[in-house]
Amino acid sequence: MTAITITDAAHDYLADLLEKQNTPGIGIRVFITQPGTQYAETCIAYCKPGEEKPEDKAIGLKSFTAWIDGFSEAFLDDAVVDYATDRMGGQLTIKAPNAKVPMVNADSPINERINYYLQTEINPGLASHGGQVTLIDVVEEEAKNIAVLQFGGGCQGCGQADVTLKEGIERTLLERIPELSGVRDVTDHTQKENAYY
């Protein structure tokens, strides 16, 4: 069973909205865009019969069906959909505390593990300089996995980017991901207008 809670108030509010659609069997679909990243957004959309995806999980509610996106399901653990009334009318809220938490382990694909460490360990440090690094690709060269990275923000054009790449980023990633052999920077560092150093 999916660990998402739809309160009675939210159920009644959504049931009223769905009834106004004049579409027999219409329900809702709950999903997260970019789950497991800092950009994760939890969404609820109308779901007409046949619009659900094969991997979706159906939750039969009192007045309608809620379809939970299969890929988002783990990120929706402990999520709560609620409706709170106020003097302006009311507001539907979705609290999904695990939406931005990456779900990776030693068996996860290498690109997911690289992104996880970039988001949780590398980028928080680079953010203090207004910078970030993103994974462009993982390429195999001479039977070795190389992470192709690109700097942005204050790191692009920074005179310390090469030191950061080798001493910080590469060292951290190689410690955490044994099958990774190195990193390569594909940033155009001639663009220096936002550079930290």
UniProtKB/Swiss-Prot annotation:
Keywords: 4Fe-4S, Iron, Iron-sulfur, Metal-binding
Free-text comment on the cofactor: Binds 1 [4Fe-4S] cluster per subunit. The cluster is presumably bound at the interface of two monomers.
Positions that bind [4Fe-4S] cluster: C155, C158
The UniProt record lists the keyword 4Fe-4S: yes
Domain of life of the native organism: Bacteria
Cofactor(s) named in the record: [4Fe-4S] cluster
GO process terms (BP): iron-sulfur cluster assembly; protein maturation
An example molecular function term from Gene Ontology annotations: 4 iron, 4 sulfur cluster binding
A family per Pfam: NifU
Family per similarity comment: Belongs to the NfuA family.
Function: Involved in iron-sulfur cluster biogenesis. Binds a 4Fe-4S cluster, can transfer this cluster to apoproteins, and thereby intervenes in the maturation of Fe/S proteins. Could also act as a scaffold/chaperone for damaged Fe/S proteins.
Subunit organization: Homodimer.
HAMAP family xref list: Fe_S_biogen_NfuA (MF_01637)
Protein name: Fe/S biogenesis protein NfuA
